[in-house]
């Protein structure tokens, strides 16, 4: 996603906070001030008034940024005002500075996001030049990475299988000069990735491990994304209502690819590795079963108490592989548990971390970039809940308590050498909000991007 080049003729959009409205009205031409007062413009989020000249041409737009309380309750509020503007070129006029200005600039780009792959015709949209004072390249990299994440999640599973997910990673690598290796089907067993193979073997589309590498200097950062392109639940079949959104079960993979774009586009000084176990959890005669005991890459055995807890299985092999290189940090993203949604809802990305510095930095960064996260604990006392006795680990502890925590504890068993952070994301916007239409959405990636320079001492 790109800003309009500055050589285009543009209409000013004057974005006003509600608390500065009266002062601004006193500086406007009397006709414009009278018009704003007569039409009830208050500067609330979503308020918009168009000003035309005597010939009927649009010459100025006033857009509300809301009250302080409204801004706390609604991110990217400027997008609500600009989304309905006539097609054409615009530039922003505002007193916003710093992080607030960056958020507004990102809102201008994300307001133009549309997933129109399956529509006969697209729509002409308003476009903005980069606001003065922002890092244009950074905002564009973030918006483009977020758009990639959304596109991948929104694509239905019939067009987004393990192969298509691998192709998306390859295309991203070609853009940035990265390298990709893909291990497919029976080769997963040869490479000692048995859990990935087992979860995906029942599907007609073969499972894969996608391994992207970029960068030759700096700290080693490995991102691991759950790539379950569709989750039927396996033999523990999901009810229809629970299966309806399961095209988004590769939201973790989509998130790490979007974040990888941001990192590479900004040329961050890291040695980046992205690992994505890409599988479909299907039902067939060779599907894995409840009661099976499976072997993992790490050598730990796992008793299967629910085939619908498959995400942690494929992540386990990928995490074990990542840990063998002893990177400076491993971060996983996964649409892993319903318990996380019950705990914090769809907007917030809960995370777990063994690294206090990163955890503290991440919490601060999330507020700076309007990407809310919340830390949950690796609570050691719950370790016994994932130990069934007959095997080393249980993939689905009974009882229903602390589901997000027990899933994170399960994953932590496969990372011993490296500091580890895990995000349990939802990856879906259930209803439209400014700059976030209903559908796939990235969570936690922008916060992590903001935190990385301090956390990795870049």
Where in the sequence are the language-model features?
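Short amphipathic alpha-helical segment within the helicase RecA-like ATPase core
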Residues: 1-227
């Amino acid at each position: 996603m790109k800003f309009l080049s500055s050589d285009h003729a543009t209409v000013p959009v004057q974005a006003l906070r509600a608390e500065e409205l009266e002062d601004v009205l006193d500086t406007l031409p009397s006709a414009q001030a009278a018009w704003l007062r007569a039409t009830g413009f208050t500067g609330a989020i979503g308020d918009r008034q168009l000003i035309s000249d005597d010939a009927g041409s649009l010459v100025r737009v006033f857009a509300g940024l809301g009250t302080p309380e409204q801004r706390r309750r609604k991110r990217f509020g400027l997008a609500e005002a600009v989304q309905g503007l006539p097609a054409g070129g615009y530039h922003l006029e505002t007193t916003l500075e710093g992080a607030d200005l960056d958020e507004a600039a990102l809102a201008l780009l994300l307001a133009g996001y549309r997933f129109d792959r399956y529509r006969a015709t697209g729509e002409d949209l308003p476009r903005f030049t980069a606001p003065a004072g922002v890092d244009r390249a950074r905002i564009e990299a973030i918006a483009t990475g977020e758009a990639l994440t959304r596109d991948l999640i929104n694509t239905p599973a019939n067009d987004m299988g393990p192969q298509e997910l691998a192709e998306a990673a390859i295309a991203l690598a070609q853009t940035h000069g990265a390298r990709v290796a893909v291990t497919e089907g029976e080769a997963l067993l040869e490479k000692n990735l048995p859990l990935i193979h087992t979860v995906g073997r029942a599907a007609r589309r073969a499972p894969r491990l996608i391994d992207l590498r970029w960068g030759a200097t700096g700290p080693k950062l490995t991102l691991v994304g759950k790539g379950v392109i569709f989750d039927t639940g396996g033999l523990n079949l999901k009810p229809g209502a629970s299966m309806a959104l399961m095209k988004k079960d590769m939201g973790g993979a989509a998130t790490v690819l979007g974040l990888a774009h941001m990192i590479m586009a900004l040329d961050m000084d890291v040695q980046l590795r992205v690992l994505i176990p890409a599988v479909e959890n299907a039902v067939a005669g060779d599907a894995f079963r409840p009661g099976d005991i499976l072997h993992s890459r790490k050598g730990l055995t796992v008793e299967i108490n629910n085939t619908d807890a498959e995400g942690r299985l494929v992540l386990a092999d990928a995490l074990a592989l990542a840990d063998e290189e002893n990177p400076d940090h491993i971060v996983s993203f996964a649409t892993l548990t319903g318990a996380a949604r019950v705990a914090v809802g769809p907007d917030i990305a809960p995370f777990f971390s063994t690294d206090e510095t990163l955890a503290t930095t991440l919490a601060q960064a999330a507020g700076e970039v309007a990407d809310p996260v919340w830390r949950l604990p690796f609570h050691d006392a719950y370790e016994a809940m994932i130990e069934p006795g007959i095997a080393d680990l249980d993939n689905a502890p009974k009882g229903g308590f602390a589901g997000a925590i027990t899933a994170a504890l399960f994953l932590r068993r496969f990372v011993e050498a490296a500091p580890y952070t895990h995000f349990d994301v939802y990856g879906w916007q259930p209803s439209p909000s400014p700059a976030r239409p209903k559908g796939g959405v990235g969570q936690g990636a922008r916060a992590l991007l903001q935190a990385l320079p301090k956390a990795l001492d870049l």
